[in-house]
């Protein structure tokens, strides 16, 4: 992909670069951790790939979490698109991991067993146990969520679909259908929810989808909302395959 094509819009999906808790193999969810130096470098490279592909985002959508916001800022700077409008919304947040937030993934798997671990981590409609409001990793009284009538205490992927896809259809999709190039910088599970919608992936098969950090995934979408390149195109397919495999292997190493 070298040039933008006005016959269709482009939707660029970018998972945040490696975070501190990606590196330490902890469930993160809505906990607001920072990027590692590797994560910042991934964000730079992601932005460079966007520029090298001839893509020129006209607007950015991201979450309220630092790791996605920072990734977006770095990537846009590298792409020379640092000046475009930015929309931040909680509905692009990572899935809330409930009482698992802060726990090591490998230790959690050892404690509860492979089947329960994978059900919490990858099933479509099985949420982890809810987090207590007084837990240090809960979002109780977090000012960024002051306008929410209720802050989630846990979520499954279905919950993310229910909050994010209506927002996508109302706010983001019309721009893409109109021929714009839109960058969405978000999280593993909010992007899995969107890819499920775009590619019409079944509730069962979505368990096998993993999104690598820092590698842009581009969908071409026409004026009717039809995806012209099912599955999208990673701007670095080899690195994306390796990154997705690394995500799938989480839970192995402590």
Swiss-Prot record:
A molecular-function term among this protein's GO annotations: phosphoglycerate mutase activity
One Gene Ontology biological process: glycolytic process
Pathway: Carbohydrate degradation; glycolysis; pyruvate from D-glyceraldehyde 3-phosphate: step 3/5
Binding-site residues for substrate, renumbered to this chain: 15-22, 28-29, 67, 94-97, 105, 121-122, 188-189
InterPro entries referenced in this protein's UniProt entry, alphabetically: His_Pase_superF_clade-1, His_PPase_superfam, PG/BPGM_mutase_AS, Phosphogly_mut1
Catalytic activity: (2R)-2-phosphoglycerate = (2R)-3-phosphoglycerate
Matches recorded under NCBIfam families: pgm_1 (TIGR01258), PRK14115.1 (NF010713), PRK14120.1 (NF010718)
Protein's job: Catalyzes the interconversion of 2-phosphoglycerate and 3-phosphoglycerate.
Protein name: 2,3-bisphosphoglycerate-dependent phosphoglycerate mutase
Species, as recorded: Corynebacterium jeikeium (strain K411)
């Amino acid at each position: 992909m070298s040039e933008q094509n006005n016959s269709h819009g482009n939707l660029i999906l970018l998972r945040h670069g490696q975070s501190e808790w990606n590196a330490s193999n902890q469930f993160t969810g809505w906990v607001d951790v920072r990027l590692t130096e590797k994560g910042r470098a991934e964000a730079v490279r992601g932005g460079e790939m966007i520029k090298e592909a001839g893509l020129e985002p006209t607007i950015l959508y991201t979450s309220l979490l630092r790791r996605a916001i920072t990734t977006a800022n770095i990537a846009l700077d590298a792409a020379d698109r640092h000046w475009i409008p930015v929309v931040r919304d909680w509905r692009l947040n990572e899935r809330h991991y409930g009482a698992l937030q802060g726990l090591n993934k490998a230790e959690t798997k050892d404690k509860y067993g492979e089947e329960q671990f994978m059900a919490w981590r990858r099933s479509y409609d099985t949420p982890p146990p809810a987090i207590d409001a007084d837990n240090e990793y809960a979002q109780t009284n977090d000012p960024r969520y002051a306008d929410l009538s209720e802050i989630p205490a846990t979520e499954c992927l279905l919950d993310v679909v229910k909050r994010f896809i209506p927002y996508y259809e109302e706010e983001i999709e019309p721009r893409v259908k109109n021929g714009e190039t839109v960058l969405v910088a978000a999280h593993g599970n909010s992007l899995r929810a969107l890819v499920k919608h775009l590619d019409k992936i079944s509730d069962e098969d979505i368990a096998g989808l993993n999104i690598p950090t820092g590698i842009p995934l581009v969908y071409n979408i026409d004026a009717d909302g039809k995806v012209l390149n099912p599955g999208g195109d990673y701007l670095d397919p080899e690195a994306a395959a390796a990154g997705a495999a690394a995500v799938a292997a989480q839970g192995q190493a402590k």
